């Protein structure tokens, strides 16, 4: 590579080189786009230049944990990440390597440390409901955040770190926690244009988080515009999970 000064990219998909060695090559040539394939869980696989990862179906892709998800840190171009519903996932350190991350579904996992999220300054949408995270201070600098779900974190008792997020549009806190009502009102005052929900209980995505109405004649729910966009961003309607067999380049 040193003999090719005009080199722009290198594709080493499925070449058998370890992640560590590939990362060393990428670090040695920061002006070259170095791409390879990583595997995580039991059946998830993506190239390191992907912008979307959908890995929230452990029954088919395998349950993610801190060990078999570590390779996600090499996917530095990710904008849309869904690793929800992974009960064994107790560490999300890999998101610290995703500076372009805009949407993150980290809900119904077992992690408690949100520190890695502080590096994701482009985050616009974050679901972290039903986790063990009670320290929200790493979120205080995420000024681009507009939609945040922290409902059903039963030991949560302090949302004051969110007061700085004055441009929030929706904040789901729910009622199944220890957050004082005074803090709820302070949050509403800090972000006057934000819809703050402190009533949902056993369904953290209830209220207007996903659906805004129900059409009795057509028997269909009317999607919230942001949820409709979310479904498009992740390919939920086509079940476009990051299984290796769904990757046309594999």
Question: What are the residue ranges of the model-derived segments?
Answer:
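Concave beta-strand-loop units of leucine-rich repeat
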Residues: 1-23, 27-138, 144-185, 189-250
């Amino acid at each position: 590579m040193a003999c090719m000064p005009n080199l722009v990219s290198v594709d080493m998909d499925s070449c058998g080189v370890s992640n560590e060695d590939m990362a060393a090559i990428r670090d040695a040539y920061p002006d070259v786009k170095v791409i390879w394939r990583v595997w995580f869980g039991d059946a998830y696989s993506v190239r390191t230049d992907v912008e979307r990862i959908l890995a929230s179906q452990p029954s088919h892709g395998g349950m993610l944990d801190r060990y078999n998800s570590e390779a996600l840190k090499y996917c530095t171009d990710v904008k849309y990440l869904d690793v929800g519903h992974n009960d064994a996932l107790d560490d999300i350190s890999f998101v610290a390597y995703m500076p372009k991350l805009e949407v993150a579904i980290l809900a119904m996992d077992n992690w408690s440390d949100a520190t890695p999220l502080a590096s994701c300054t482009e985050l616009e949408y974050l679901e972290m409901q039903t986790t063990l995270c009670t320290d929200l201070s790493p979120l205080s600098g995420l000024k681009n955040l507009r939609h945040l779900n922290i409902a059903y974190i039963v030991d949560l008792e302090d949302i004051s770190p969110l007061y700085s997020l004055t441009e929030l549009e929706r904040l789901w806190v729910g009622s199944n926690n220890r957050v004082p009502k005074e803090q709820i009102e302070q949050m509403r005052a800090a972000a006057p244009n934000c819809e703050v929900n402190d009533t949902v209980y056993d369904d953290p995505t209830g209220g207007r988080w996903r659906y805004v109405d129900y059409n009795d004649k057509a028997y269909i729910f009317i999607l919230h515009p942001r949820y409709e966009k979310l479904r498009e961003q992740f390919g939920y309607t086509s079940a476009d999970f990051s299984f290796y067999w769904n990757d046309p380049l594999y």
